[in-house]
């Protein structure tokens, strides 16, 4: 897994402007998102591998619902500008090259910017139960964006 994360990290820095990956399909988990997002699953942890890696692309203002991951999550920001909000912490600006670590069971969401797309690679140890929670309201999203100013 360390080798996978290192490879993904190097890829993220080297290609932060021009993604060498297809953005994927309209996100099949769209019921847990507001707005349009795309998903390209690189590795679904099949074949005995213990990590899942996916590219998620967010259109402007699109975002996940609040959620948690029982084993945490690593986000490697590849392009654009967005935001990650972990409950009880200051909002994190998601810009190319940023590596954002989300602890186990931390309530959080990730999003594109108000006028910008954002693409990240998500890496999670498997199995890793995701618990989907409430939607992030427009007012809540705007408030989180103001934290970045």
Located regions from the model:
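Short acidic-glycine-tyrosine-enriched beta hairpin
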Residues: 88-105
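Ligand-binding loop in jelly-roll beta-barrel domains
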Residues: 83, 104-130
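A short, N-terminal "cap"/entry segment at the start of jelly-roll beta-barrel domains
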Residues: 4-6, 10, 15-50, 130-149
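Structural recognition of the beta-strand scaffold that forms the well-ordered cores
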Residues: 66, 74-76, 101, 120-122
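Histidine-centered catalytic micro-motifs
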Residues: 64-71, 106-112
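Conserved short histidine dyad/triad with adjacent acidic residue
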Residues: 52-69
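Glycine- and acidic-residue-biased ligand/ion/polar-headgroup-sensing regions
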Residues: 70-82, 87-88
């Amino acid at each position: 897994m360390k080798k996978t994360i290192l490879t993904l990290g190097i890829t993220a820095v080297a290609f932060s402007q021009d993604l060498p990956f297809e953005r994927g399909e309209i996100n099949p988990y769209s019921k847990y998102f507001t707005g349009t997002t795309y998903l390209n699953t690189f590795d679904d942890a099949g074949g005995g591998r213990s990590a899942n890696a996916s590219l998620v692309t967010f259109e402007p203002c699109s975002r996940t619902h609040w959620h948690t991951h029982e084993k945490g999550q690593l986000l490697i920001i590849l392009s654009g500008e967005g935001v990650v909000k972990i409950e009880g912490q200051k909002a994190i600006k998601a810009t190319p090259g940023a590596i954002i670590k989300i602890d186990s069971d931390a309530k959080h969401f990730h999003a594109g910017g108000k006028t910008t797309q954002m693409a990240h690679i998500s890496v999670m140890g498997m199995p890793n139960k995701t618990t989907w929670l409430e939607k992030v309201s427009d007012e809540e999203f705007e408030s989180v964006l103001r934290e970045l100013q």
